[in-house]
């Protein structure tokens, strides 16, 4: 018998954590963190590190990795991740410790302990685990992200992590078709089961038109963006469309992520385009360079993607008042975020300061997740006998997906703390 327990991510987006227990091995898949409206961390359910045969990290976003170092205080289970994910996770861990105003169950020492236990893997690698096995496949979500195919006690289980079936400028789509169609269970995210993404070509065209129009009118473009994945995708999109007449600046943690990703071209769709994009971009190294960047027209890409902090707030205060400028939000904006406030009200309260924006405000759906139609096609790839467990999704979106697939074995009601048995 194999038990699959949801330690986090059941009926919610984020704090992803799945525990798979067989007769020989217990494998933890991700161990992420969410943050409440006040920035207080919300951790997955507890698991005893000494009981774990292995931990797999799908990618370096905090909602999948942010609680991991807390498991490396008194034990040291092996951690499997791509070398790119491991390096990106390090900067995310350290940034979280630096910026968190709340207690975290780890500090620098636990981060070092975590990284010492990394066993680097690449796409299509298979590792043996006391008679069971783990195979790692491209997830197409962010550079270095993996899906994991577990073969445990004779049962085959696919954990998607966050995945994207569609090709982007940065990445190839998820490698679904290397997975056998008759596996026993798919544990899949359904973050965006609430709708279908627009065609990528149309999205890029509208994004580039917004940038060009702003530049033609003498304005600058501010793009608040996620550090890992989104920043690089937008930079490549600009260079692909030859937007090189004004400087492109990268600020915040994104500039470090850019450098790390450049070391691992094997995880990119077009390494040459990536190198070209970095050549055309300029790093902001501090306040002196920020002031210089504002003297003339420019495109500035910087965290935080929802305007909850970071250098983006600095630029917003200085660029937001000019109608010639544009604020482009290329990511999901949570209802409690300043970015959402700007989209709906034209003003945002950030750090108890109300900021009114006269600049043009755009939102583009540059998602790195699969949409409803893709998720349906993904599920239909598998045999009818394959069980489907939906995680990392709101209850409403999970239900919507299941309604399209009523004949399938979809367990949409599992919440954090519940389990299924095979």
Locate predicted features.
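Short acidic-hydrophobic, aromatic-tinged amphipathic segments that line or gate anion-handling sites
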Residues: 117-123, 278-287, 414
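Hard-cation-handling environments
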Residues: 208-330, 335, 391-392
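Conserved acidic residues
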Residues: 53, 184, 298, 325, ...
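A short, acidic, amphipathic alpha-helical segment used as a generic capping/interface helix at domain edges
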Residues: 310-316, 367-383
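Redox- and metal-dependent alpha/beta enzyme cores, enriched for Fe-S-associated oxidoreductases
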Residues: 321-356
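His/Asp/Glu-rich metal-coordinating catalytic cores
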Residues: 2-12, 16-56, 61, 65, ...
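Glycine-rich phosphate-binding "P-loop"
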Residues: 188-205, 223, 271-274, 357-373
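Short, solvent-exposed amphipathic alpha-helical segments in soluble enzyme
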Residues: 21-23, 150-153, 174-177, 203, ...
């Amino acid at each position: 018998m194999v038990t699959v327990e949801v330690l986090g991510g059941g009926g919610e987006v984020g704090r992803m954590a799945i525990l798979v227990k067989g007769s020989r091995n217990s494998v933890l898949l991700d161990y992420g963190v969410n943050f409440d409206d006040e920035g207080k961390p919300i951790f997955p359910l507890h698991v005893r590190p000494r009981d774990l045969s292995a931990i797999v990290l799908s990618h370096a976003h905090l909602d999948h990795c942010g609680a991991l170092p807390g498991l490396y205080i008194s034990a040291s289970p092996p951690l499997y991740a791509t070398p790119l994910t491991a390096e990106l996770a390090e900067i995310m861990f350290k940034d979280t410790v630096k910026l968190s105003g709340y207690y975290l169950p780890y500090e620098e020492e636990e981060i070092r302990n975590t990284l010492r236990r990394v066993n680097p893997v690449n796409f299509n690698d298979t590792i043996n685990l006391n008679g069971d096995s783990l195979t790692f496949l491209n997830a197409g979500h962010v550079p270095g992200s993996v899906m994991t195919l577990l073969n445990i006690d004779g049962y085959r289980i696919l954990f998607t992590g966050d995945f994207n079936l569609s090709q982007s400028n940065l990445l190839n789509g998820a490698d679904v078709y290397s997975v056998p169609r008759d596996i026993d269970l798919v544990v899949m995210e359904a973050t965006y089961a609430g709708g279908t993404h627009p065609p990528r070509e149309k999205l890029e065209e509208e994004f580039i038109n917004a940038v060009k129009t702003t530049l033609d009118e003498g304005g600058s473009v501010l793009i608040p963006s996620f550090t890992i994945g989104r920043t690089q995708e937008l930079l490549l999109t600009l260079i692909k469309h030859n937007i090189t007449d004004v400087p492109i600046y990268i600020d915040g943690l994104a500039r470090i992520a850019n450098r790390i990703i450049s070391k691992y071209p094997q995880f990119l769709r077009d390494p040459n385009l990536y190198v070209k994009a970095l050549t055309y971009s300029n790093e902001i190294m501090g306040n002196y360079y920020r002031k210089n960047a504002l003297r003339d027209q420019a495109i500035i890409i910087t965290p935080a993607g929802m305007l909850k902090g970071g250098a983006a707030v600095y630029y917003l205060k200085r660029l937001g008042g000019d109608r010639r400028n544009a604020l482009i939000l290329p990511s999901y904006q949570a209802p409690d975020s300043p970015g959402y406030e700007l989209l709906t009200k034209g003003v945002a309260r950030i750090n108890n300061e109300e900021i009114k924006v006269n600049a043009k405000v755009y939102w583009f759906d540059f998602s790195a997740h699969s949409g409803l139609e893709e998720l349906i096609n993904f599920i239909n790839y598998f045999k009818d006998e394959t069980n489907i467990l939906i995680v990392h999704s709101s209850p409403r979106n999970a239900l919507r997906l299941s309604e399209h697939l009523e004949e399938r074995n979809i367990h949409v009601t599992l919440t954090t703390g519940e389990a299924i048995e095979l």
